[in-house]
């Protein structure tokens, strides 16, 4: 036993690492355990921050976007062209609206310009046509007037239906008048005064024998009616152009369903 103890002491003495100045080499550094454990903790799944609810909601909404919204991010050539024409239409209509308000450059001429538009209103034309129909004594005159009355009623119903469907506002905030409410001419597209002026002008040029100066004046009247509606800020330029086109097709439709003299006499007698 003493021999074994002496051998163990000699072995420890011979081992250089057991000396006091080398004991620190056998022990791991004090700061190494914590970084490893902290790194191990950081790499673990339990320490990952939970995803924010806002980010998850945005990703969910982006996955549920309809195709129309995705297509708006990459508009087609037709969409770009349409938006460009629409912007030009609004800009030009606002520039031509020189009588749109009291502070406009031509505000003093607003009453006169508005009077030009009233010459193509539906109520005066329907009332005047009925009055002429009552006083007419010829079959040919009654036939023309009855078909003109049909065309005017068709124009009012067509314009009111399209305006109710489109519901486009004018370039300026202008409230419709009492006569506009009676004819349901509330919105901007299409321009009812312009369609009526075009239809009546074409009707008179086709069924009345007029001199050349009167024909020119009739065409100028229709053009001035459309321009007056833009000047007072009631319609856009495209509204007036569309009104002219609709008025022409209304005339063509009345020509197709033209009522004969016998039909007109039957309706007059029933009335």
Curated annotation (Swiss-Prot):
<feature type="topological domain" description="Extracellular">
    <location>
        <begin position="224"/>
        <end position="239"/>
    </location>
</feature>
<feature type="transmembrane region" description="Helical">
    <location>
        <begin position="113"/>
        <end position="133"/>
    </location>
</feature>
<feature type="region of interest" description="Interaction with MTOR">
    <location>
        <begin position="70"/>
        <end position="91"/>
    </location>
</feature>
<dbReference type="GO" id="GO:0042392">
    <property type="term" value="F:sphingosine-1-phosphate phosphatase activity"/>
</dbReference>
<feature type="topological domain" description="Cytoplasmic">
    <location>
        <begin position="261"/>
        <end position="271"/>
    </location>
</feature>
<feature type="topological domain" description="Cytoplasmic">
    <location>
        <begin position="1"/>
        <end position="112"/>
    </location>
</feature>
<feature type="transmembrane region" description="Helical">
    <location>
        <begin position="142"/>
        <end position="162"/>
    </location>
</feature>
<feature type="modified residue" description="Phosphoserine">
    <location>
        <position position="62"/>
    </location>
</feature>
<comment type="function">
    <text>Plays a role as negative regulator of myoblast differentiation, in part through effects on MTOR signaling. Has no detectable enzymatic activity.</text>
</comment>
<feature type="transmembrane region" description="Helical">
    <location>
        <begin position="240"/>
        <end position="260"/>
    </location>
</feature>
<feature type="transmembrane region" description="Helical">
    <location>
        <begin position="203"/>
        <end position="223"/>
    </location>
</feature>
<feature type="modified residue" description="Phosphoserine">
    <location>
        <position position="43"/>
    </location>
</feature>
<dbReference type="GO" id="GO:0010832">
    <property type="term" value="P:negative regulation of myotube differentiation"/>
</dbReference>
<dbReference type="GO" id="GO:0005635">
    <property type="term" value="C:nuclear envelope"/>
</dbReference>
<dbReference type="Pfam" id="PF01569">
    <property type="entry name" value="PAP2"/>
</dbReference>
<comment type="subunit">
    <text>Homo- and heterooligomer. Interacts with MTOR; controls MTOR-dependent IGF2 expression during myoblast differentiation.</text>
</comment>
<dbReference type="GO" id="GO:0005789">
    <property type="term" value="C:endoplasmic reticulum membrane"/>
</dbReference>
<dbReference type="InterPro" id="IPR036938">
    <property type="entry name" value="P_Acid_Pase_2/haloperoxi_sf"/>
</dbReference>
<feature type="topological domain" description="Extracellular">
    <location>
        <begin position="134"/>
        <end position="141"/>
    </location>
</feature>
<comment type="similarity">
    <text>Belongs to the PA-phosphatase related phosphoesterase family.</text>
</comment>
<dbReference type="InterPro" id="IPR000326">
    <property type="entry name" value="P_Acid_Pase_2/haloperoxidase"/>
</dbReference>
<keyword id="KW-0539">Nucleus</keyword>
<keyword id="KW-0256">Endoplasmic reticulum</keyword>
<feature type="region of interest" description="Disordered">
    <location>
        <begin position="1"/>
        <end position="69"/>
    </location>
</feature>
<keyword id="KW-1133">Transmembrane helix</keyword>
<dbReference type="GO" id="GO:0016020">
    <property type="term" value="C:membrane"/>
</dbReference>
<feature type="compositionally biased region" description="Polar residues">
    <location>
        <begin position="24"/>
        <end position="36"/>
    </location>
</feature>
<keyword id="KW-0472">Membrane</keyword>
<protein>
    <recommendedName>
        <fullName>Inactive phospholipid phosphatase 7</fullName>
    </recommendedName>
</protein>
<feature type="topological domain" description="Cytoplasmic">
    <location>
        <begin position="163"/>
        <end position="202"/>
    </location>
</feature>
<keyword id="KW-0597">Phosphoprotein</keyword>
<keyword id="KW-0812">Transmembrane</keyword>
